[in-house]
Swiss-Prot record:
Protein name: Exodeoxyribonuclease 7 large subunit
GO cellular component, as recorded: cytoplasm; exodeoxyribonuclease VII complex
Top-level taxonomic group: Bacteria
Keywords: Cytoplasm, Exonuclease, Hydrolase, Nuclease
Keyword Methyltransferase recorded: no
Keyword Transmembrane appears in the UniProt entry: no
MF term (GO), any: nucleic acid binding
Pfam families: Exonuc_VII_L (PF02601), tRNA_anti_2 (PF13742)
Reported function: Bidirectionally degrades single-stranded DNA into large acid-insoluble oligonucleotides, which are then degraded further into small acid-soluble oligonucleotides.
Amino acid sequence: MKDYTYSVTEINEYIKDLIEGDPYLTNVSVYGEISGVRPRKGHIFFSLVEENARLECVIFGGDNMGIRLQEGRMALVEGSVSVYIPHGTYRFICSNVRYLDRVGMYQIKFETTLKKLLEEGLLSRPKKTVPRFPRKIGIITSRDSAALQDVIRTARERKAPIEIYVFHTSVQGDSAREELIKALRKANEYDLDLVMIVRGGGSKEDLWVFNEEDVIREILKLRHPVVTGIGHEIDRVIADFVADVSMHTPTGAAEYVIPDASEIHEDLDSFLEKLIASLSNRFDMEERRLETLYFRLRMIGRRKLELNEFKIERVKELAAKLRKKLMDCFEQDQEKLESLGRMLESLNPLRPLERGFVLVKKEGEIVKESSDLKRGDVVSLVFKDGTKKAQVIG
C-alpha cells in the first residue's frame, strides 16, 4: 500500500463518509436517560446516558419548535449518527423523541438517596452559622482547578486577611469518591472557621460524586460550617441540600464567605458615626432633664424646700446614680470602640512588617508578582523601621 499523508480535514471527511454511509447508523433508534439539556441558538443539545457511556445528541431547531426535554427521563430517540468535521466529533442527529414509562438510572439513584436522607431527618438539621469574618478557610477541590483559582483571586481582590488551606481531591472520575471522602476527613482534623467545597460546571454525570451517599454522610460529619460552590445553574446536587450555604459557582461562594476590607471600613465608619450621635443625644437629653428639675426646685419656696429636704436629697442621689450610669454606658461604648479599632488595625497592610516581612516597591508601586521585575531594576525595600534601596541581579 502506498504511503500517503492526509490532512486533518481529509481524515475527518473520510470518517464522515464511512459513518454517515453506514446503514446501521442511519435512521436508527437509541434509548437512554436524558441528561445535560442545553438549548442554544434555537437548537437543543443533550446527552443520552447509561451507567458507563454517553451519546451526544442534537435536535436542530428544536428550541424554536417548543420542544422541552425532561432531565432524568428515559427516552427512545430516532435519528442518524453524524460527524462534525471542524471538531472531529460525532453526534446523534435526532428526528423524534419518545419518552418511555420510567425514569433513568441516575434519577432513580438521586431520588432514592434524597428520600433516605429525608427520612433520617438529615436534611432538616439546624444549619451552622457561617462566621462573618473567617480567618481560616478550608477549600476542598482539585489543586489544579479553575475553581480554586477563582476563590484565590476573589480573596486577593478583597484584600482579606485570611489563611487558605487546600485539601486536594479529584472532582470527577473513578477515583473522585474515595479521594473526596479522604479530603473531607482530613479537613475535619483542622481548626478551621469554615469549609468550602467547590468545582466548576459540568454535566450531571460529571457532578455525580456530589450525590454519592457516603460522600454526603461525610459532609454531614464536618464540625465546621460548609459552603458549596458547585458550578451548575439548573440542577442541584445533594451536597447543596446538606450544606449550610450553597451558591451556584465557586466565585459566588467566595464572595459570600470572604469579607471585603473596604466594606469593613465602611461598616466601622458607619458604626462610629451612629455611636457618637447616640451618645451626644443621650447626654443632651439628660442635661435638659436635670436643668428642668433644678429649675422646678428653685421655684419652690424656701419653706417648701425645708419641708421636702428629704426629697431633694433623694433627687440628688438619683442624679448621682444617673451620672454614674451614663459614665458606665460611655465606658462600655468606649470598649466597643477600642475593639473596633483593634480590628481595623489588624487590617493594616503594614502590620506584617512588624513580623519580619518586607514590602517591595518599584517606582512607588507595590510589586505583587516576580514577573513585574527584571534584571537591573531598582526597588525600594520597606522595613518596619525604614526603607532601603536594592537592585535586582537575577
